[in-house]
Amino acid sequence: MNDRIIEFDPLIEGVLINRYKRFLADIELETGEVVTAHCANTGPMKGLLTEGAKVRMSVSPSPKRKLPFTWEQICVLDAKNEEVWVGINTLFANKLIKKVIEKNLLNEIIGEIETIKAEVPYGKDKKSRIDFFLTPKSSNPDKRNIYIEVKNTTWMKGNVALFPDTVTKRGQKHLIELKELIPASKSILILCITRKDACFFSPGDDADPLYGNLFRESFSAGMIPIPCSFEFHKDHITWNGIKPLK
């Protein structure tokens, strides 16, 4: 446990002033300077947007970028009133899960893997793209190809991580398509929980009841949900294990 999955240059710390227009956040640096950072998470970020909260940002040296800062993490209080850092950059989720697969941390569930491909067209009309398409090694007793959809998960109630935190038509469609892959292929939904305080995972029924129903239907049909938890630090992210459903 606590394997380092990704390392990066130390992030820049500041304080959240406000988040607006979905993609933007004003952040005060430790020097007192206020900068505008890009926010890759376009969702409501339920339970996270507290003005005055500590945040961390990466900075790009590219002169082509209009906004050099990218908002990466925010510090919130967990159910025990203790600080926990939450990864809010949704673009990180697939990077984390690919690393986890490459490090064989999911082998007990998916078996040994021969190849990993990203963004592969699938579905009846081939207009959808699956996050990861895996082929098993010949030693893998399950010879079926593996389709993996990844969902970034930040919302918490108590010690339970929840997805989604708002109505998601796209997420509903993904569940239907994952179900249709069964039994010819192995169908997996990975919940990338970007905070260390989750003990369980449940679908976010309060935010999207239909998603919850589709989740349970797909699960009953053979879809495999894997809630993967991570711990976020100033210069790295560690593996925090697979959490059970609740």
Swiss-Prot record:
Superkingdom is Bacteria
Q: Which GO molecular function entries does the Swiss-Prot or TrEMBL record give? A: DNA binding
Q: Which organism is it from?
A: Prochlorococcus marinus (strain MIT 9312)
Q: Which family, according to UniProt?
A: Belongs to the SfsA family.
> Which gene specifies this protein's sequence?
sfsA
- NCBIfam families, per database record: sfsA
Upper lineage ranks?
Bacteria, Bacillati, Cyanobacteriota, Cyanophyceae, Synechococcales
Q: What protein does this entry describe?
A: Sugar fermentation stimulation protein homolog
Q: Name one Pfam family in it.
A: SfsA_N
